[in-house]
């Protein structure tokens, strides 16, 4: 697991010595990397009594177009500024451009955190 604690190096490059051991709440998880496929979800215990629903894969998006929100089917990922390799792997992240049955749309939600894909239809599609 990834350590989300502070860096082991100072600003100058010198080593910082550990004051305490790594704690469980400082650990992170691997990213969900939501793909375009049949819907699959994972429930994760969050801090407190909360739960997070991660979308491991989905093919449905809530697409908004001038106030109207419709449920559209995702066909594939057209562009993803987070990582160029995500395009050919069909991974959906916030800011990705997806091809839907209504046209191209930009993802506004974080599917790995919220478990759903919300998007805004692009003008030029």
Curated annotation (Swiss-Prot):
Keywords: Ribonucleoprotein, Ribosomal protein. Residues 27-36 have a biased composition (Basic and acidic residues). GO terms for cellular component: ribonucleoprotein complex; ribosome. It holds the Pfam family Ribosomal_S8e. GO terms for biological process: translation. Disulfide bonds: none annotated. The keyword Translocase does not apply. Residues 1-36 are annotated as: Disordered. Residues 7-26 have a biased composition (Basic residues). One of its GO terms (molecular function) is structural constituent of ribosome. Belongs to the eukaryotic ribosomal protein eS8 family. Part of the 30S ribosomal subunit. This is Small ribosomal subunit protein eS8. The lineage of its organism: Archaea, Methanobacteriati, Methanobacteriota, Stenosarchaea group, Halobacteria. The gene is rps8e.
């Amino acid at each position: 697991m990834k350590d989300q604690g502070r860096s082991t190096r100072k600003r100058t490059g010198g080593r910082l010595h550990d004051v305490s051991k790594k704690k469980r709440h400082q650990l992170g998880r691997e990213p969900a990397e939501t793909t375009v496929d049949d819907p699959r979800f994972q429930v994760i215990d969050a801090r407190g009594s909360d739960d997070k629903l991660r979308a491991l894969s989905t093919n449905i998006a809530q697409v908004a177009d001038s106030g109207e929100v419709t449920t559209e089917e995702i066909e594939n990922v057209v562009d993803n500024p987070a990582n160029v390799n995500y395009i050919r792997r069909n991974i959906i992240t916030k800011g990705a451009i997806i091809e839907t049955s209504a046209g191209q749309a930009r993802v506004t939600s974080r599917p790995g955190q919220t478990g759903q894909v919300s998007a805004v239809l692009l003008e030029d599609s």
